[in-house]
Amino acid sequence: MEDFVRQCFNPMIVELAEKAMKEYGEDPKIETNKFAAICTHLEVCFMYSDFHFIDERSESIIVESGDPNALLKHRFEIIEGRDRTMAWTVVNSICNTTGVEKPKFLPDLYDYKEDRFIEIGVTRREVHTYYLEKANKIKSEKTHIHIFSFTGEEMATKADYTLDEESRARIKTRLFTIRQEMASRGLWDSFRQSERGEETIEEKFEITGTMRRLADQSLPPNFSSLENFRAYVDGFEPNGCIEGKLSQMSKEVNARIEPFLKTTPRPLRLPDGPPCSQRSKFLLMDALKLSIEDPSHEGEGIPLYDAIRCMKTFFGWKEPNIVKPHEKGINPNYLLAWKQVLAELQDIENEEKIPKTKNMKKTSQLKWALGENMAPEKVDFEDCKDVSDLRQYDSDEPESRSLASWIQSEFNKACELTDSSWIELDEIGEDVAPIEHIASMRRNYFTAEVSHCRATEYIMKGVYINTALLNASCAAMDDFQLIPMISKCRTKEGRRKTNLYGFIIKGRSHLRNDTDVVNFVSMEFSLTDPRLEPHKWEKYCVLEIGDMLLRTAVGQVSRPIFLYVRTNGTSKIKMKWGMEMRRCLLQSLQQIESMIEAESSVKEKDMTKEFFENKSETWPIGESPKGVEEGSIGKVCRTLLAKSVFNNLYASAQLEGFSAESRKLLLITQALRDNLEPGTFDLGGLYEAIEECLINDPWVLLNASWFNSFLAHVLK
């Protein structure tokens, strides 16, 4: 058969057929009948188009050999025979210029006279059978179907045969000749029987061997075979009564579907108890910075040098005293730790050459604060498995805490603009493709909206602290290293600025596993008097360490400076996530981008510029007891960023659980709002799953209270 095909058909057609088969991973040497069928189909498409032109008056004419200079346009565009990408490009371009509906499958030809796509079929079976299969497959009124058989029969949509009698007769004669040539070589019977119907992918997909055995093993209960399960799934009416479906599925399931109405949901129950306390790894809105502008001192960029320079900008140090003790801690130790930091910084300055890092003396106060020698001694299991009363520590249930107003204030502050820029516009190479141009434009607009945002300051501060702490934990495992908490920014005028927030002292850090803990003591400057919201500072011992002159509208006022000291801990995995906080920028940019995409698809053009530059338009930001809060696009960017940053700063198991479970209730409620008549079963169980995550975490409690505002708003 292969030899016959190569002799019988034009070499160009043979080459196109080989290419088409290779594209689908088929071998012309093996699947010879298919090879012949593809060549035949290609030849019919070319003959269909041959000699048919449209003249200057848009009339259809037949020219077999004439003036090559006549202004003639081919009547048919040949799509069959091109590679897929090119073929779709041609189809798209035809649809765009003529307004014809885009077909779901690649057709064979386009008729410029009748303005329609044509599907050509060549069959070795009954033309009616083949016609119906084609029509069922393409399911389009718009594509014209024309079927030829090797016996001289034909069939076309609405009996409209498109071409004149003579052109069609040429095609039929050629097909008859091919059939006779095959028959004379004894190839026809095999060729005729090899034709299969138009298949859809699912019908062709046969599972055999191991996969078949796995499929049979993994069926739901009560199904004997894959066929039996398939038949059941095919007959499953999606909009029927759900209870019936559930009972069909399994004998054990007896869920009653309850309609979810406006009166169904209740607000989430937030826990009672003392107000929740601050648990972030560093101070947020309460932080105070000692800064130097245009740093140009020797060793600029070395953290310890920068820190000493920043400390020198302040002259109001005084004898420290405790103003808010830590309930459970040995407070004098915190006081001694700060005094030790001051003394050791003074020692560094008295040295000839300032070292690049500073390891603190292992004093009793630091050993206590860093939990040195506090870990219970580890004993090999072999040595103690015979102890009769061996048991795990009883661990106390976490104490419930109520929502406090400070966390909403923290969030509001994170959304605000500062007077410094915390990120530079990345230098990325020239845009090459149009999509890159749009991407750069979006990135630049977004960066402009968030570069001065306080949440961005928290990102850079978090990245710096976590990077420094992880470095020190690996490089100086046994040392109590002093790590300055530093950030860098640019002022409105574009001048560089280095800021010092305070110090961290790291404990022993032999971190083998991702979750092994390194303890640290943080000491951070602040102007916030802890006595105003003592519950927020439950975990801190707060000292008063100096007075600062502040310029105000009424002149200079002196305000006390506080030092917030606490023992804390982190792990390699937490530091890794802290170092990657810049991802929050990407996450919020993607959320904004999906808003732009939605807007663009409605308007059918890229709306990036309008989106950011139309200052009059307001967008929904969130729900509050007052209703839907709206704001400018910049405010939306900053709010989304702040949410992403707080998810990182306050990451916890409670947040994971709350986010996953409350999302289900959120989707049901949105379905109710959109009048989709949702139904639920075991709603009580869902509430239980959500509320078991509401224990004492400030960020989770705030999100739960926002969720209640959203519920109230939807159910109005």
Curated annotation (Swiss-Prot):
Cofactor(s) the record lists: Mn(2+)
Keywords: Cap snatching, Endonuclease, Eukaryotic host gene expression shutoff by virus, Eukaryotic host transcription shutoff by virus, Host cytoplasm, Host gene expression shutoff by virus, Host nucleus, Host-virus interaction, Hydrolase, Inhibition of host RNA polymerase II by virus, Manganese, Metal-binding, Nuclease, Phosphoprotein
Binding site for Mn(2+) 1: 41, 108, 119-120
Cofactor binding mode and count: Binds 2 manganese ions per subunit.
InterPro entries associated with the record: INFV_PA (IPR037534), PA/PA-X (IPR001009), PA/PA-X_sf (IPR038372)
Binding site for Mn(2+) 2: 80, 108
Classification via Gene3D superfamilies: Influenza RNA-dependent RNA polymerase subunit PA, endonuclease domain
PTM description: Phosphorylated on serines and threonines by host kinases, including human casein kinase II.
BP GO annotations: cap snatching; DNA-templated transcription; symbiont-mediated suppression of host gene expression; symbiont-mediated suppression of host mRNA transcription via inhibition of RNA polymerase II activity; viral RNA genome replication; viral translational frameshifting
Enzymatic class: hydrolase
Residue numbers covered by motif Nuclear localization signal 2 (NLS2): 184-247
Superkingdom of origin organism: Viruses
Physiological role: Plays an essential role in viral RNA transcription and replication by forming the heterotrimeric polymerase complex together with PB1 and PB2 subunits. The complex transcribes viral mRNAs by using a unique mechanism called cap-snatching. It consists in the hijacking and cleavage of host capped pre-mRNAs. These short capped RNAs are then used as primers for viral mRNAs. The PB2 subunit is responsible for the binding of the 5' cap of cellular pre-mRNAs which are subsequently cleaved after 10-13 nucleotides by the PA subunit that carries the endonuclease activity.
Protein name (Swiss-Prot/TrEMBL): Polymerase acidic protein
Organism the protein comes from: Influenza A virus (strain A/Goose/Guangxi/345/2005 H5N1 genotype G)
Taxonomic path: Viruses, Riboviria, Orthornavirae, Negarnaviricota, Polyploviricotina
Designated gene of the protein: PA
